[in-house]
Amino acid sequence: MKISPEIKSPNMKLSKVYSILFLVATLTLTSCGIYKFNDASIDPAVKTIKLGFIENRARYVNPQLSPKLNDKWQLKIASQTKLTRTTSDDAHYIISGTITNYDASQTVGVSNQQASTNRLTVTVHIVFRNTLSNKTEEFDVSRSFDFDANLTLTQAEARLLDEMVRSLTDDMFNRIFSNW
């Protein structure tokens, strides 16, 4: 006697496909709750943030740095946290800052009695106040950017501005929100 193969209806096949898709979607969505795409660790009680303007008070002022740094800083906070911006002094986090150093210098490496690279060092002083815990922390974020000694400072600034802004905002964010 011959055993006939099991005949599957199209509805059964479709049902299996839907079951597999449902399982994959469920696993994907639940795994997103376990892993974060950024390292920001913010107390769930913190809901609001006030960002003060980062003013340039360095001896030499690059007129483009402060506005670009402020714009990038605000965008980073908005895109990588769920905090609501406010202008109120009773915000849960209050962050202000000042560019305190913007200095070009020659590096030690010398070729034919002339420095082969120069270095631009930028320092931002940050005041971070957590009004929920009534704690204030002050710290400096400093970065150095090397550039070819054949370039003028103006040329180097034009080439380095985006990198300076990105690096400084990343360092500020990591220091405040990622406990670095």
Q: What positions do the PLM features span?
A:
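Surface-exposed short loop/turn segments
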Residues: 37, 44, 79-84, 89-90, ...
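Bacterial N-terminal signal peptides that target proteins for export
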Residues: 4-21
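Tryptophan-rich substrate-binding surfaces of secreted polymer-degrading and adhesive proteins
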Residues: 1
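Compositionally biased, intrinsically disordered linkers/stalks adjacent to structured regions
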Residues: 158-180
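A structural "domain/chain start" motif
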Residues: 30-82, 90, 132, 142, ...
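Bacterial N-terminal signal peptides
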Residues: 19-30
